[in-house]
């Protein structure tokens, strides 16, 4: 246990050390200031703008949102076409056939929405072309879209009397070129150096050492996709077993790299926010709130897995190793599970369906909080800003003052947008789960009975309704109902809050800041951090406690038998 604690502390310290300079760098990218890569990348940037015909003029929230939707729609159609026609496309040495309409629809929606929910196994269903040209490209642009929208939201708080929130095409291009591509290149090289596969060769047929039986070894350009899948909080694995598969994550060192990559940009964006609003204490307050909830979650998962359930007492001293890789152990698996669900990533290095009931409850609850504990790149922070505004609003009601945040008054229109930001994911999750449990096809998809079977369904629709993408693997997801309903849920969960955030940003940008007074609520002290954590957890608890009581909590009490 001491080793696990040291490992977790080392990880968090290293994460913060790396995130601070990256956050400062991203702030410079956001405002268009020169960075150390400018000499190399500025000519590429100018050429890209000319090629795309980009006009640098500012956009209103309506035009910005329209550009996001149009760009995403084109990506959706392209990915769906590639997946359905992959049998006729190049880079298909294994002769993979095109996906069915429902599965292609679900997969396209999943990757365009930055969810990366996978109802297929990559090495058995997709060609190299589909993986690299279809899905990897979406991993870049869906992540860049989230960060671009966050840039727009931040401008809403720092601009005065403006009717625009920035230019989507410029934001998208700069995020991709200056942030995601360089980081992905470095991480991909590190992963390849540690044994992660990167090849366009045919699958290999080898004889096993044990009995001489023939075995098919899948290959592919995995490292390049894994780099952006983690950095962009995408999470979709090149192989079906995701980061539990040795070709994706062969050692403890690559496990550390991938966990750092999952949280690096979300944490750095909080640093960037503090720099952008000219008050680092605001960023530190948000970081502290996120980190407290994250650490509590890590501790809860680790204890649940290390000491298992009451019925297992005295049976094992190494903790619950079911569904875990020996090279990662309980500590590495628990930290990865917390990171991937706190950050809206969804990659796994252990099977979440095999976690103990309380160990599985924590990742599920992290998602049900709205993916705001670090959350997805961009989307996590603008979701947390929604919770901050809600907290300020509640505090204002308590003391009878007009609520303010960063000098901008919070008005009824702002609260309507915040409600859309906060309430859409839980409504989609609960509605989807309620409908699903009544469908015979979903009931047949569940591998377990009772409370754990319900947990599998709840986890699946929580994952899709909050754009995470991880799953309890006992849930067979490739059915027409789950594919179609899940796809609609993922798209709505992505784009309704995104559009609400943009309209919130425009309304804020049009306001004049008001001077702080003695009655202004401080949003950077310990009291506010406690209030913020309370609001985030309370909204999640009120929304999901009845469902959790029927699932993982009831499942936990079965371990007393």
From Swiss-Prot:
Record key words, sorted: Cell membrane, Ion transport, Membrane, Potassium, Potassium transport, Transmembrane, Transmembrane helix, Transport
Matching Pfam families: KdpA
Membrane topology: Multi-pass membrane protein
Keyword field contains Cell membrane: yes
Magnesium as UniProt keyword: no
One GO CC term, this protein: plasma membrane
Localization: Cell membrane
Membrane-traversing stretches: 4-24, 65-85, 133-153, 177-197, 253-273, 285-305, 380-400, 417-437, 484-504, 528-548
Record GO terms (molecular function): P-type potassium transmembrane transporter activity; potassium ion binding
Family recorded in the similarity comment: Belongs to the KdpA family.
Role, per record: Part of the high-affinity ATP-driven potassium transport (or Kdp) system, which catalyzes the hydrolysis of ATP coupled with the electrogenic transport of potassium into the cytoplasm. This subunit binds the extracellular potassium ions and delivers the ions to the membrane domain of KdpB through an intramembrane tunnel.
NCBIfam families attached to this UniProt entry: kdpA
Subunit and interaction comment: The system is composed of three essential subunits: KdpA, KdpB and KdpC.
Protein name: Potassium-transporting ATPase potassium-binding subunit
Organism: Listeria innocua serovar 6a (strain ATCC BAA-680 / CLIP 11262)
Lineage: Bacteria, Bacillati, Bacillota, Bacilli, Bacillales
Name of the coding gene: kdpA
